[in-house]
C-alpha cells in the first residue's frame, strides 16, 4: 500500500512552473535553477507576440558549458539530464531586434531522479515498482505537456483576437475617413458645378 501511494503521488509532485515575460529590444533575460546530478529538466517555450515571433534561447550548466542553443526560434521544447550538481542557467535573448519587444511564455518542468519506493522488500517488487513509477512519470509528463499546450493556445488566441480587433477598428476608422472625404468631394463638386452654370447664365 505504501508503494502504491508513493507511485501515485509522483503524478502530482513533479515540480513545474509557467511564466510570461517581456523581453525588450537588445535585451537578454536569464533564469536559474539548482539541480542535482541525474535530475531531468524540461524547458518549453513559445513567443506569443512581437516582431517575427522569434527569440534566441540558450541553456548553460554550472561549468558554463552550453547544453542547448537556438537562434530565432518561435517555439520549442528541450529536455536534458543534469550532468553535475549546481546552478543551471537558461536565457531568452532579443538582441537581434533594435525596436520590437517580445512576449515569451515558457514552462520549466523538473523531474527528480528515480528513488526506490519505501517498503519494497524483494528485488522483483522493486523492479516492478520502478517500472510502474516510470510509466506514471511519463503519463504525468504527457498530461503536463497537454496542459501547457492548452495554455499556449489560449495565449495565442488572445493575442490574435487583440490583433483582429485592432485591425477591425483601424479598418472602420479608415472607411469612415474615406466616406467623409467622398462626401466632401461630392459637395465640393456640386457647388463648383452650380457656380459654373451660374456664371454661364450671367454671360
Swiss-Prot record:
Residue stretches spanning the membrane: 171-191
Signal peptide per UniProt: 1-18
Ranges facing Cytoplasmic side: 192-203
> Which of the residues are on side Lumenal?
19-170
GO terms of biological process kind: endoplasmic reticulum to Golgi vesicle-mediated transport; Golgi organization; intracellular protein transport; regulation of Notch signaling pathway; regulation of transport
Q: Which SUPFAM superfamilies match?
A: Supernatant protein factor (SPF), C-terminal domain
**Superkingdom assignment:** Eukaryota
Asked whether the keyword Signal is assigned, the reply is yes
Result when mutating residue 47 to I:
In allele sel-9(ar26); suppression of lin-12(n676n930) egg laying defect
Regarding the membrane, this protein is recorded as:
Single-pass type I membrane protein
* Domain GOLD: from-to ranges: 28-110
Provide the effect of residue 140 to F.
In mg550; defective expression of the proteasomal subunit rpt-3 in a pbs-5 (proteasomal subunit) mutant background
* Pfam annotation, one family: EMP24_GP25L
Q: Please give the family membership noted in the entry.
A: Belongs to the EMP24/GP25L family.
Function noted in UniProt? May have a role in the negative regulation of lin-12 and glp-1 transport to the cell surface. May also have a role in a quality control mechanism for endoplasmic reticulum-Golgi transport; the budding of coatomer-coated and other species of coated vesicles, could bind cargo molecules to collect them into budding vesicles. Involved in regulating the expression of proteasomal subunits such as rpt-3 in order to confer resistance to proteasomal dysfunction.
Protein name listed in UniProt = Suppressor/enhancer of lin-12 protein 9
Q: Which gene encodes it?
A: sel-9
Amino acid at each position: 500500500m505504501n508503494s502504491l501511494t508513493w507511485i501515485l503521488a509522483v503524478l502530482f509532485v513533479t515540480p513545474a512552473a509557467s511564466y510570461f515575460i517581456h523581453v525588450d529590444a537588445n535585451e537578454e533575460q536569464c533564469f536559474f535553477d539548482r539541480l542535482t546530478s541525474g535530475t531531468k529538466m524540461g524547458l518549453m517555450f513559445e513567443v506569443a507576440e512581437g516582431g517575427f515571433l522569434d527569440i534566441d534561447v540558450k541553456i548553460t550548466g554550472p561549468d558554463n558549458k552550453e547544453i542547448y542553443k537556438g537562434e530565432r526560434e518561435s517555439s520549442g521544447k528541450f529536455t536534458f539530464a543534469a550532468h553535475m550538481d549546481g546552478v543551471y542557467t537558461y536565457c531568452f535573448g532579443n538582441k537581434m531586434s533594435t525596436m520590437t519587444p517580445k512576449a515569451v511564455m515558457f514552462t520549466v518542468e523538473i523531474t527528480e531522479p528515480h528513488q526506490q519506493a519505501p517498503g519494497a522488500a524483494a528485488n522483483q517488487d522493486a523492479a516492478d515498482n520502478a517500472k510502474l513509477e516510470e510509466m506514471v512519470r511519463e503519463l504525468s509528463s504527457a498530461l503536463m505537456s497537454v496542459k501547457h499546450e492548452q495554455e499556449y493556445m489560449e495565449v495565442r488566441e488572445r493575442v490574435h483576437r487583440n490583433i483582429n480587433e485592432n485591425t477591425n477598428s483601424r479598418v472602420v476608422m479608415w472607411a469612415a475617413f474615406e466616406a467623409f472625404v467622398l462626401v466632401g468631394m461630392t459637395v465640393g463638386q456640386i457647388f463648383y458645378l452650380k457656380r459654373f452654370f451660374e456664371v454661364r447664365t450671367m454671360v
